[in-house]
Structure formats: structure tokens, C-alpha cells
């Protein structure tokens, strides 16, 4: 008797979801996507779709009910609706990676607690706590909103006392103040874990334009074999210590041969797009293999620069 074709449910229908759909179809799976936008990119290829908000509990339950396994390509699905679903349906990555990444303070606390070096930081809720944090951290520093920040949004660099008044309007929501790291460049690593084994793709050197990733270079110039090995080992230890499963990308600041945790994303990452053509397998395929219960593939370094 032929094995039943599995359906992968995807929370999110953006370009990352589209590429998950492509790899799922190549591996013989069906796909069902949920996204608020009726013209979401992934809908063009998915076998089915649901147009609904990410906080629509009934729609998310429908997605889970109609799927054999569920993943996400968008990290701001509310925990209030996802946590109950995790207890009833097959969401192997679970809510924990999302929860840890949805709040910058919680994210930094978690990184530090699990062995990654971070810049100095402090929670900021009002002008008094901002000034107390600045007294400890000093200038320059970066004030960030704790939630819903991306691609440089919700951030303000404070170079000196004259910048403090500009920061006050941001304090209408919880914030975090971080020491500014005069980094040489940013690098990222994409990993996939099945709960026992962790594989990682080659580390990329990232270049941003207007706060948005523009280029990723692999092999990463400025990262020698020793630094590369230390970064990969730290990333793998972190993933195992947190007991994360599925896919995880970590961005690091590189400064004088050392690396500092910046942020993480529990989904495919834009800096990992080169893996589609540059490696023996790619980040989307390995996520799908994990979701389908297939063994992860050994990854080789690119044979030429990407």
C-alpha cells in the first residue's frame, strides 16, 4: 500500500514560504499556507491556502487540522494562539524558538544563559530607566523596541546626551538599550537540527543597505578557519542547549576576531538563499526533510564563491 502523501502546513505565505513550498513539492509533499494577504507569494504554488490573520485562532486551528505537520516562516505568530495548538497538533519546532525570538530582551537573556556572548544591554521602560541604563552602558548605544522590530525598524543610535530627547517617544513601548558594537562586519550561520544531530551551512558575511540585507558572501572573507570553527561550535551548542529543533539562523557581530550574538530567527534566513545553488543541499530542503522525518543531508562547502 502506497504511503499517504503528507501535507505541510505553513504559517506565512511570503517569499520564504514560497521556497519552502517548492522544496516540499520536490520531496513529494503537499502544502497548505496561511497568510493575511490574499495575494501572498506562496499561494501561487501551494496546494491550498487560507486567508486569515496570524491571530485568528480558528483559522490557525484549521491549518493544523488539515496538515500532517506544521511549520512557520514568520516569527510573529502570537503565542496566545500557538501554544494551545502545539499541545494538540504536530508542530515539531514548537513555540519556544518563536517565543525566545519575539522579544529582544528575552532573546538576549536566552542567548547569554546558553553560552553566547552578547553586548551589554538593559531593559528600558521610561526616561529614568533609560538614563540609568546609559549610566551603566555609556555612549554610543542603540535603543530598540523589544518587539516587532525588523530590518532596522524600531532602532535609534544614541551617540551622546543630545540624542536622548529623540529617544523619549520610543518609550511608549518596552525597549532595550544595547551597547553599540563597533563591529568589523556581520556574519550569520544557518543550522538545522532533528533533535539529535545539528547540521550547519557555511557561515556568510553579510552586507546591509538601509538596514536590509543586500549581499551575503560565502566563503566569508575575514573569518579564518579557527574563528569559523568556534562560531559553528558555539551555534551548535546553543541550539542543543535550548533544545531547539528545526531551522535556526543566528546573526553575529564580528569584532577583532571575536563574535557577539546579535539576533536569531527560527525560520529560513535571507542570508541562506545562496545555499539553493551553492551547496549540496539548501536550507529550505533541510527544513522540509526535518518536517517529513527524513535524515538530514551532509553539507559541503561551496566549490566557488557566492
Task: Name every feature range the model reports, one short phrase each.
Residues 49-53, 122-125, 158-159:
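Short acidic-hydrophobic, aromatic-tinged amphipathic segments that line or gate anion-handling sites
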